[in-house]
């Protein structure tokens, strides 16, 4: 039991004013083993400090995502070492496990294998400090997991949705298909006409089965957990500013577990360079 012997050696050194060499010989413990703990603590000090600082800023991140960010910063570490410090510092959060429901006969779209092959789109609701409800149009690329836009307003009709899609298309091109639910904004004539004019296929999921639009549903969960629930929006403009800041961070900085803990924008760039 080296840990116990190290403690005894330290006690003997102090209590009997004995040298380290004599105390180690008396207890049958090598001096290298005795010093190991001190060196280990010294090696961990910088990593521990950075981990605590990062965890304070990224309160909803677990140790694996924090590990990815530390590695990206150039710190020599691995997930086991980070997990040990994560537990020692009491940074682990209790997460309520959600009940997973498996839908029988669920029809899901094939996984996208290239950018703009298939987008996923949905609407999310929240409110500002005055109690006024705000709506968010969320869009995710099924291949790169990038979020090209989160449109925030008090109402978002079909005409507004098509304008947002045209704006995104002017920057990155049109998708081949969009997966979406059966909400009135998406079943509108305006969006139907847009899809025919642009040659974009609309793939509507079955009513009451959001699992068929899993990519955007997962994204919406992260949006709510890391942004909506973590912020107090004083006004519509304040909500727009904070949500856009979160979107930029999601695309550019946040490690994505489905992309081997690489941020979506970096994944998209690397993919484009490999295909060039």
Predicted regions and their residues:
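Charged DNA-binding/catalytic regions of mobile-element recombinases
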Residues: 1-276
